[in-house]
Amino acid sequence: MALAREIYEHYWEKGWAVVENVYSIEETEHIAALATRLCEELMQEDDYIVDSSDDGARAPRKLDLPFERHPDLRNFALDRRLSSLVGEFINDQPLLLADQIFMKPPHFGSKKPYHQDNGYFHCHPGDKVLTAWIALDDVDEENGCLRYIEESNKGPILPHLPQPGEPYNFVPPADLIDLSKEALAEVRQGGVVFHHSHSLHTSHHNESDR
């Protein structure tokens, strides 16, 4: 799958870019249904993957390393359409470090605070590391699309500090995040959002009924 020049330039200038129509609706619906089934099975044994609503209801939060759990999930993550785009962004042969599926059910959980992926990954050089975020549903502001601090990819990795009561969140100091440069990355089902390992990003609570 060829990468348009303007998308490539947007990625390196702003730190993120959207490529629509990488996967089909049928493919993403199959993966979403499979991930939901696996999460529901795992919820019985692992509270780490569970979110709770205000009324105490439980729903799956995320699935770590899904490519290890089912051949369809492995093929989805390693699909040539995706890997060819990654290779064009980084001008190198891509390797998969890890993958996750975030469920983000409506009215559950909380927003993911601003962070940089390489604040967690510690991979070098940072220009050769990116995240490919595949939309299994239409994603917009209402249901919690990704938000970026544009051009933060050009800066350093900031100190990421643990948050009390949030064992999976490490975040930079708020005064180092320039919210005047925030941009929303809306994407349709089957599209992919790519971002640089230094790009500051967040996603808010799902306020929709989707």
Model-derived segments and their meaning:
Residues 204-210:
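Ligand-binding loop in jelly-roll beta-barrel domains
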Residues 1-14, 19-114, 120-122, 161:
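Non-heme Fe(II)-dependent double-stranded beta-helix
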